[in-house]
């Protein structure tokens, strides 16, 4: 008789959905007020001039202008600012 033994079960095969984090607008780019600049977990980038920080640490533009990334302070933190055009 032709028999096929039952296949075993596995405990693998799951993965969480990607969260699409990262820099959405880069330095020198023009961004409108309310535009998302960085989606992040925690404060990898800190808000500078004319940049707001959301509840989930998303950085967004408070005014229209060009994006400027800078490293400053004694701890060499990365700041994102908007320079008005």
UniProtKB/Swiss-Prot annotation:
Gene Ontology CC, one term: cytosolic large ribosomal subunit
A molecular function (GO) term: structural constituent of ribosome
Keyword Ribosomal protein: yes
Family the entry assigns: Belongs to the bacterial ribosomal protein bL27 family.
Pfam families noted in UniProt: Ribosomal_L27 (PF01016)
Lineage: superkingdom: Bacteria
Source lineage: Bacteria, Pseudomonadati, Pseudomonadota, Gammaproteobacteria, Enterobacterales
Keyword Ribosomal protein recorded: yes
BP GO terms, sorted: translation
Originating gene: rpmA
The entry's keywords: Ribonucleoprotein, Ribosomal protein
Identification of the protein by name: Large ribosomal subunit protein bL27
């Amino acid at each position: 008789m032709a028999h096929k033994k039952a296949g075993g079960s596995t405990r693998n095969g799951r993965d969480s959905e990607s969260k699409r984090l990262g820099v959405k607008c880069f330095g020198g780019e023009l961004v409108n007020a309310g535009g998302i600049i960085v989606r992040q977990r925690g404060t990898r980038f800190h808000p500078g001039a004319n940049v707001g920080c959301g509840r989930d640490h998303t950085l967004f533009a408070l005014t229209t202008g060009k994006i400027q990334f800078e490293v400053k302070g004694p701890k060499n933190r990365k700041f994102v600012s908007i320079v008005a055009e």
